[in-house]
């Protein structure tokens, strides 16, 4: 496979339907898959329901498969909750997620996917050769996180918003250009040219 990058820098790191369609057509409609991660690492960019639906329309039109990293889905800071592209393209999407960010379980190596059955069968083949299994303690903790602790991300979100706003204020005072992240926990700042 050949990687095709779509530069979103000039659009505040937001992929638009026009950018996506242009990339597909430049590849002679041979583009097979798109990898999306949102909230994005490292920019914190998120997408509205309308933006996601518009991207899905293009992907459906050209029958492009989607691999979507949604590990920060519980850490969005806008009024609108996270919207998965799988809502619009359930038969064309593999969603990758986990508990490392939403439940502060980094290092536990506990993740999961949502995918159509045909893809899942293929994923299992790869998985069984790459990973033995999550340890028993992590599996029990994961069940607890997804049931009893399903709202555990809320206090973290409030804390991250406070930290984000503080860092943005201070870095802006120092002359950094920052696009306010609507998710994840990163600040992707442009370093001023005269900064030493």
Task: Identify the residue ranges that each predicted region occupies.
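PLP-dependent class I/II
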Residues: 1-196
């Amino acid at each position: 496979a050949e990687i095709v990058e779509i530069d979103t820098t000039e659009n505040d790191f937001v992929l638009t339907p026009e950018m996506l369609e242009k990339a597909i057509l430049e590849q002679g409609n041979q583009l097979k898959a798109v990898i999306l991660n949102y909230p994005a690492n490292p920019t914190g960019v998120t997408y509205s329901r309308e933006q996601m639906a518009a991207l899905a329309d293009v992907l459906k039109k050209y029958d492009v498969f989607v691999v979507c990293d949604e590990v920060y889905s519980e850490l969005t800071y806008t009024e609108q909750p996270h919207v998965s592209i799988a809502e619009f393209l359930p038969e064309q999407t593999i969603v990758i997620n986990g508990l490392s960010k939403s439940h502060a379980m980094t290092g536990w190596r506990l993740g999961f996917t949502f995918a159509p059955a045909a893809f899942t069968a293929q994923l299992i083949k790869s998985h069984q050769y790459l990973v033995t299994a999550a340890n028993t303690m992590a599996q029990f903790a994961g069940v607890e996180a997804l049931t009893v602790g399903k709202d555990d991300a809320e206090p973290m979100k409030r804390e991250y918003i406070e930290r984000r706003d503080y860092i943005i204020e201070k870095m802006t005072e120092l002359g950094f250009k920052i696009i306010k992240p609507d998710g994840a926990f990163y600040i992707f700042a442009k370093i001023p040219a005269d900064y030493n």
